[in-house]
């Protein structure tokens, strides 16, 4: 009886098995037999009349255990008292039925069979071990070819393939016993068994040392890796060929009788039956000594059936069941969304949960939710039962159940008690970030819908149009505590993505607050003075003063010392009312609300209150302004009718002007002054400018203050109020209602030239309506795709970052990154203050121009600090970053900085990787799916000039200009910069000047804000003559390299360079224009090189052959469509492309060294560019560029490391290898942020840094030295360092390597944890690899731990782990002390026997009574 208690799974007395790591390896036949409880000999399952399992069949009770608890099959022994007895009649052990879930069987195969995973999973492990190709292997295994195993003295080769005839001939030629050749899996098994791994490894290493060429070393390295992994893991190669097959327990492949005498069965039973049938038939054939050919066929069929069992459809035909559906094999059980990993281990259904529709609950407090009584009764049943018993209202659970079912009144009282202070968790699918699950205290409500507090809607992304939410009940005390302390909605005021409050009013509340804080001239009661806030309220109630009138009010304020003082404010009664809600704090003065509050301002107010007044105050404040917002919006009664949409009076004049402009462009095109593409660009531009003008006119009309008869201001237009306050609608939508709809896009992203001129108020014409449907439909189909894509991106990000946890406080690294203001096209997009907020300073920051230290290294920068640094005018500073953190696992708190959701230093154990992944993935659905071509013209025209954003002095860098005949200054350098400096000579802004830019300012000139600095042609890239001379065409052969295009519309001809390589005769042409002087010699530049202008495809020639040219004249123009303004891959695809680290199609070429450009010999249709290093000791570097691509450098140009030699998007790998980790990080951060900024989404840089850190974990070995690492292998930095330390300790040469950038999918599949990788993608491949290498999973990440069913090592789970470690170490100390004491006692006891008795009490310490 006693033993029984310990075996009961629900009994806590038995300690669960504790383990630290999981190892997976190949199973040897002996291992398989040791698991097995018996061999399965028959394919039968159960007897269909008695429903009893057949003996020796797939469900045999003798092997797997009894069908009923404690009862043998024939019924001879029943009940507990016989437990452990084996019945002599039916051979069944009397025990729990549960053992049928854990006992395995086996099948002895009559012939060995290859395991398909090791055969077909690429690269084929068996093939690599034997150095055979997969085709040859399959021929041997499926009995088509013989293979020579022992050549003997014949001239055959080991491993040589022979057909049946060749085998016969060889036997005739050499005699039967002269050599051994075999066929089938036996042959392969013999060959594998014969391999001596150590000798093989030695041999391969020796070969590798000698191997030359490209492919050979690669192949040897691959084989060497496999051999090494077998050596290290202790696996034997012949175990990849199976002689015994394990059979999984019957309860895991159940057979369920349906009504009507039929059975539902798992597909595995069918697959096993095929194997057993064929195996038995094969045994019989071998016994009967059947002809070879029949036996062989049977063996092949056996091989195929085992293949199907392990991985159906991997090879040959898919085996289907009776219903033509492919059978689910063992591999399919693990794979995919429905597989074991993702369906059962990572995502489970939970008890004590329910779901219902949500409705709004405006009278709830922020920490409450309304729970329907019916749901609560069901969810809290166990608590109610126990409470009923405790109160003595029921004596048994059955009685309690009856009471609850009848819904007696006392049950409701008890439910109230139970629910008090017991938080529940609410979840809205899709849970895109951690705020998708929050805890609330339930209040019971009638009805059937859950009530949700309006302020948390934005966190859940919920609305009340029929959304459903799920409720979960945390049961244990610990779970309730965590829900209350960590997940309560009041603890999640700030968003983890950017640290801004996420509990902000929206829609109605914003409209109410906006209306409340309006100020209007001439309202009733203007100029009155009130002594305190109560007086204001009385006057409002009495109707003596209007909400919006200008009055003076005395408001109590807190000064710096914390004393209450009265201050007078010019304000309105509405603002005074709002001010009365503010917490009393010096940092939250009345000025905070004494202004017109729009959405941004409200968020700012909440942020300030949260930062300075603490959490409790701010939560109360949020609740109060929500109530006030709703009430005021309701009292204001703002609504809108058709007349609220105002059409500006001058609409048609603006439209007609634009029409005239467009006519001009058409005419210019007819006259051949501009190309079709340029015309299109200009027309689109003109219309978007027209749209902007119209919008401005409309906004100024609609926002203008109108006066009533009595001279008081009228209420603002209600549509304007809604849009302006940020409650609903936007300027774009108002423009469509009252201006013009504007330009429409085709589904492929192109913009239709003819805009929709009508607005919705006037109504669209049929044609306009048709144009509109085009893009609208695309928008809808986009949305559906977007959700799936965004979800997949999040999943990949989570997978790559899941094991990034804060593991220590400080890693003590010296490294850091530089933070500076982010500037995009000369406009500041993120100030330095924003970027350094919540980071730790790496070096002391000094006030510019002085030695005063503003903040010391190692300090966390808070809001005040950031402001101080901004005001001091610091340009850049060094900050700690997760990228440079040197922690072994995860990151350290100092490198990470502030936990954005709490506003304090990040805690140890915070899962920052997952937070980063969620922050980047969650806004994914808001991003667009589209790829914009011509850089987003719909967003308003191409910028073609730049104005000074600051005032200061102009300084040029790398000046290279010339003045043309009209006296205009043009830049002809490639890397010229224009810098604006302040009076201290500090750089305020810098702009790169493109080739052909026209300058309006001179060196040293003082500029004011808004002065025009320079302009350029946004649509074409000019090629400018540097010296005067005569143009001479070279190789510009008409018809081959140039086509004369006569425009049908204009009758004008233009010369356009075409792709000369396409023509058969044109392959060796080099089309260019050279300048010759009067003497017929080419004009040379300052370096003495002749001035030649190579032409690229699509260039338009602007000069005739033999034409006189002045310096600064345009020789040719390249349309920007040819020299693309980078194809802007917008939105989600761009983010995915960046994180997957894909090489862009025409990626830019980056100079690897400083040096001078030389053009080398051309090769086929590539141009050879080499850089001669300025530093003599370095090698020259060569690049091949496709001909006809525009190359922005010319012969003899000096380029610096990191300059672009060919335009385009750079490949992130190049940035890493040439310019280092920090440059890569900056590139990634800027590019990702650009995409999100376009949608107005704020994400903190550190999240992107965390992901980039995870992408940079691996090192690629460039030279293996004398270590065990192999060239080209990807290893973790730690493994790399460890291997090198080992080598150095032995005095050997260390390996060389460099960090390598992996895309997130690759990085996830290459994590150290094979369990995590297998649950992500390509399950079979990962597991095959892991088992061959005998990989160990140390269970450090979150995913592995969830899968094996323990607490995750982050958050409270991490704390539990630490406590366990401490306890274990203390136990060790105690045990150690006890051992020493025992030894001392033994030493004392040795000389005098009588003292031994006294020595015993020494050992008796309190700890030893465990």
Curated annotation (Swiss-Prot):
Zn(2+) 1 binds at residues 72, 74, 87, 90. It is an enzyme of class 2 (transferase). Its cofactor is Mg(2+); Zn(2+). It holds the Pfam family RNA_pol_Rpb1_1. Mg(2+) binds at residues 463, 465, 467. Binds 1 Mg(2+) ion per subunit. Binds 2 Zn(2+) ions per subunit. It catalyses: RNA(n) + a ribonucleoside 5'-triphosphate = RNA(n+1) + diphosphate. Zn(2+) 2 binds at residues 811, 885, 892, 895. Gene3D superfamilies: 1.10.132.30, 1.10.150.390, 1.10.1790.20, 1.10.40.90, 2.40.40.20, 2.40.50.100, RNA polymerase II, clamp domain, RNA polymerase Rpb1, domain 3. GO terms for molecular function: DNA binding; DNA-directed RNA polymerase activity; magnesium ion binding; zinc ion binding. InterPro entries: DNA-dir_RpoC_beta_prime, DNA-dir_RpoC_beta_prime_bact, RNA_pol_asu, RNA_pol_N, RNA_pol_Rpb1_1, RNA_pol_Rpb1_3, RNA_pol_Rpb1_3_sf, RNA_pol_Rpb1_4. DNA-dependent RNA polymerase catalyzes the transcription of DNA into RNA using the four ribonucleoside triphosphates as substrates. Belongs to the RNA polymerase beta' chain family. This is DNA-directed RNA polymerase subunit beta'. Keywords: DNA-directed RNA polymerase, Magnesium, Metal-binding, Nucleotidyltransferase, Transcription, Transferase, Zinc. It comes from Ruegeria sp. (strain TM1040). NCBIfam families: rpoC_TIGR (TIGR02386). The RNAP catalytic core consists of 2 alpha, 1 beta, 1 beta' and 1 omega subunit. When a sigma factor is associated with the core the holoenzyme is formed, which can initiate transcription.
């Amino acid at each position: 009886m006693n033993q029984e208690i310990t075996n009961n799974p629900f009994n806590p007395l038995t300690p669960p098995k504790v383990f630290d790591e999981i190892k997976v390896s190949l199973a040897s036949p002996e291992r398989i037999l040791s698991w097995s409880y018996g061999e399965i000999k028959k394919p039968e399952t159960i007897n269909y009349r008695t429903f009893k399992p057949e003996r020796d069949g797939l469900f045999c009770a003798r092997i797997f255990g009894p069908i009923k608890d404690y009862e043998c099959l024939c019924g001879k022994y029943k009940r507990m008292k016989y437990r452990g007895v084996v019945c002599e009649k039916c051979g069944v052990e009397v025990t729990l039925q549960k053992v049928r879930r854990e006992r395995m069987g086996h099948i002895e195969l009559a012939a060995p069979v290859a395991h398909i995973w090791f055969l077909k999973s690429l690269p084929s492990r068996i093939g690599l071990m034997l150095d055979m190709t997969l085709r040859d292997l399959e021929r041997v295994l499926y009995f088509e070819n013989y293979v020579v195993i022992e050549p003997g003295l014949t001239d055959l080769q080991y491993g040589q393939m022979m057909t049946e005839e060749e085998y016969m001939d060889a036997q005739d030629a050499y005699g039967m016993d002269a050599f051994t050749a075999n066929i089938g899996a036996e042959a392969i098994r013999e060959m594998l068994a014969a391999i001596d791994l150590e000798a093989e490894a030695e041999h391969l290493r020796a070969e590798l040392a000698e191997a030359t060429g490209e492919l050979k070393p690669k192949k040897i390295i691959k084989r060497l890796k496999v051999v090494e992994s077998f050596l290290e893991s202790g696996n034997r190669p012949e175990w990849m060929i199976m002689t015994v097959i394990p059979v999984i327990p019957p309860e895991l492949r159940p057979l369920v009788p349906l009504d009507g005498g039929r059975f539902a069965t798992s597909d595995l039973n069918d697959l096993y039956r095929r194997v057993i049938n064929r195996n038995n038939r094969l045994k019989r054939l071998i016994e009967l000594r059947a002809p070879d050919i029949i036996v062989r066929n049977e063996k092949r069929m056996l091989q195929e059936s085992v293949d199907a069992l392990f991985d159906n459809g991997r090879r040959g035909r898919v085996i289907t069941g009776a219903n033509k559906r492919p059978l689910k094999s063992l591999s399919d059980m693990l794979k995919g969304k429905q597989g074991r990993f993702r369906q059962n281990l990572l995502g489970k259904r939970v008890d004590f949960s329910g779901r219902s529709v949500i409705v709004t609950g405006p009278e709830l407090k922020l920490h409450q939710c309304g729970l329907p009584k019916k749901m609560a009764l069901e969810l809290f049943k166990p608590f109610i039962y126990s409470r009923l018993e405790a109160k003595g209202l029921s004596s048994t659970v059955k009685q309690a159940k009856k009471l609850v079912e009848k819904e007696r009144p006392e049950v409701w009282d008890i439910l109230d008690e139970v629910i008090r202070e017991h938080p529940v968790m609410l979840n809205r699918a899709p849970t895109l970030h951690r705020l998708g699950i929050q805890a609330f205290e339930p209040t019971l409500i009638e009805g059937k819908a859950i009530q949700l507090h309006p302020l948390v809607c934005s966190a859940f992304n919920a609305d009340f149009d029929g959304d459903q939410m799920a409720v979960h009940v945390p049961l244990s005390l610990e779970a309730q505590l965590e829900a209350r302390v960590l997940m309560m909605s009041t603890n999640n005021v700030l968003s983890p993505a950017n640290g801004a409050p996420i509990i902000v009013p929206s829609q109605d509340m914003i409209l109410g607050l906006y209306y409340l804080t309006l100020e209007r001239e001439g309202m009733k009661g203007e100029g009155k003075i009130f002594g305190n806030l109560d007086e204001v309220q009385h006057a409002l109630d009495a109707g003596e003063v209007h909400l919006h009138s200008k009055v003076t009010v005395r408001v109590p304020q807190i000064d710096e010392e914390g004393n209450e003082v009265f201050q007078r404010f010019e304000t309105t009664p509405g603002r005074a009312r709002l001010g009365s809600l503010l917490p009393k704090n010096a940092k939250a003065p009345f000025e905070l609300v004494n202004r017109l509050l729009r959405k941004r301002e409200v968020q700012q107010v909440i942020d300030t209150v949260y930062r300075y007044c603490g959490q409790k105050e701010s939560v109360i404040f949020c609740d109060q302004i929500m109530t006030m917002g709703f009430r005021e919006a309701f009292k204001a009664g703002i609504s809108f009718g058709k007349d609220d949409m105002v059409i500006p009076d001058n609409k048609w004049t603006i439209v007609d002007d634009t029409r005239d402009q467009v006519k001009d462009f058409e005419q210019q095109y007819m006259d051949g002054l501009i190309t079709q593409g340029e015309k299109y660009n200009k027309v689109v531009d003109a219309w978007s400018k027209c749209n902007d003008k119209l919008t401005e006119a409309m906004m100024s009309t609609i926002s203008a203050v109108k006066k009533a008869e009595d001279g008081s201001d009228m209420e603002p237009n209600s549509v304007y109020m809604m849009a302006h306050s940020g409650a609903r609608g936007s300027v774009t939508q108002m423009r469509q209602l009252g201006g013009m709809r504007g330009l429409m896009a085709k589904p492929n992203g192109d913009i239709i030239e003819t805009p929709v001129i009508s607005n919705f108020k006037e109504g669209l014409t049929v044609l306009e309506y048709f144009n509109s449907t085009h893009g609208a439909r695309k928008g809808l189909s986009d949305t559906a795709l977007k959700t799936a894509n965004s979800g997949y991106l999040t999943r990949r990000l989570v997978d790559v970052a899941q094991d990034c946890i804060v593991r220590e406080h400080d890693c003590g690294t010296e490294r850091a990154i530089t933070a500076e203001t982010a500037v995009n096209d000369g406009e500041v997009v993120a100030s330095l203050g924003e970027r350094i907020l919540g980071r730790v300073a790496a070096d002391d920051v000094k006030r510019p121009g002085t030695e005063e230290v503003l903040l010391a290294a190692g300090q966390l920068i808070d809001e005040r600090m950031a402001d101080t640094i901004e005001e001091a005018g610091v340009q850049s500073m060094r900050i700690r970053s997760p990228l440079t953190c040197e922690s072994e696992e995860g990151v350290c708190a100092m490198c990470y900085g502030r936990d954005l959701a709490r506003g304090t230093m990040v805690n140890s154990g915070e899962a920052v990787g997952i937070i980063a992944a969620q922050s980047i993935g969650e806004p994914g659905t808001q991003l667009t799916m589209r790829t914009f071509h011509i850089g987003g013209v719909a967003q308003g025209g191409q910028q073609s000039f730049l104005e000074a954003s600051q005032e200061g002095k102009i300084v040029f860098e790398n000046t290279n200009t010339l003045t043309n005949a009209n006296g205009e200054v043009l830049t002809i350098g490639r890397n010229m910069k224009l810098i604006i400096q302040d009076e201290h000579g500090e750089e305020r802004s810098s702009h790169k000047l493109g080739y052909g830019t026209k300058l309006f300012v001179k060196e040293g000139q003082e500029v004011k804000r808004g002065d025009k600095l320079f302009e350029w042609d946004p649509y074409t890239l000019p090629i400018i003559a540097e010296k005067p001379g005569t143009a001479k065409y070279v190789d510009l052969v008409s018809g081959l390299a140039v086509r004369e295009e006569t425009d049908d519309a204009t009758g004008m001809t233009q010369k356009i360079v075409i792709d000369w390589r396409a023509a058969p005769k044109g392959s060796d042409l080099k089309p260019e224009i050279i300048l010759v002087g009067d003497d017929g010699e080419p004009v040379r530049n300052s370096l003495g090189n002749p001035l030649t202008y190579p032409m690229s495809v699509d260039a338009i020639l602007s000069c005739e052959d033999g034409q006189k040219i002045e310096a600064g004249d345009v020789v040719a123009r390249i349309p920007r469509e040819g020299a693309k303004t980078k194809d802007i891959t917008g939105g989600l695809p761009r983010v995915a492309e960046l994180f997957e680290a894909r090489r862009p199609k025409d990626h830019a070429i980056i100079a690897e060294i400083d040096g001078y450009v030389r053009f080398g010999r051309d090769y086929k249709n590539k141009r050879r560019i080499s850089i001669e290093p300025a530093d003599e000791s370095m090698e020259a570097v060569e690049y091949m560029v496709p001909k006809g691509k525009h190359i922005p450098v010319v012969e003899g140009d000096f380029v610096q490391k990191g300059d672009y030699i060919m335009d385009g998007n750079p490949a992130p790998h190049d940035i890493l290898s040439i310019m280092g980790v920090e440059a890569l990080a900056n590139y990634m951060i800027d590019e990702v942020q650009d995409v999100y900024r376009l949608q107005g989404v704020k994400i903190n840089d550190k999240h992107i840094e965390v992901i980039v850190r995870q992408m940079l974990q691996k090192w690629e070995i460039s030279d293996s030295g004398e270590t065990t690492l192999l060239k080209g292998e990807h290893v973790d930095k730690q493994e790399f360092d460890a291997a090198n330390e080992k080598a150095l300790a032995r005095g050997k040469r260390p390996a060389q390597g460099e960090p390598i950038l992996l895309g997130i999918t690759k990085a996830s599949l290459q994590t150290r944890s094979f369990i995590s990788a297998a649950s992500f993608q390509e399950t079979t491949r990962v597991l095959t690899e892991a088992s061959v290498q005998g990989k160990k999973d140390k269970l450090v990440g979150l995913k592995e731990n969830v899968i094996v069913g323990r607490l995750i090592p982050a958050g409270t789970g991490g704390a539990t782990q630490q406590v366990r470690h401490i306890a274990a170490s203390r136990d060790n100390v105690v045990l150690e002390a006890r051992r020493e004491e025992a030894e001392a006692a033994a030493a004392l006891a040795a000389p005098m026997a009588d003292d031994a008795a006294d020595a015993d009490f020494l050992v008796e310490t309190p700890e030893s009574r465990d």
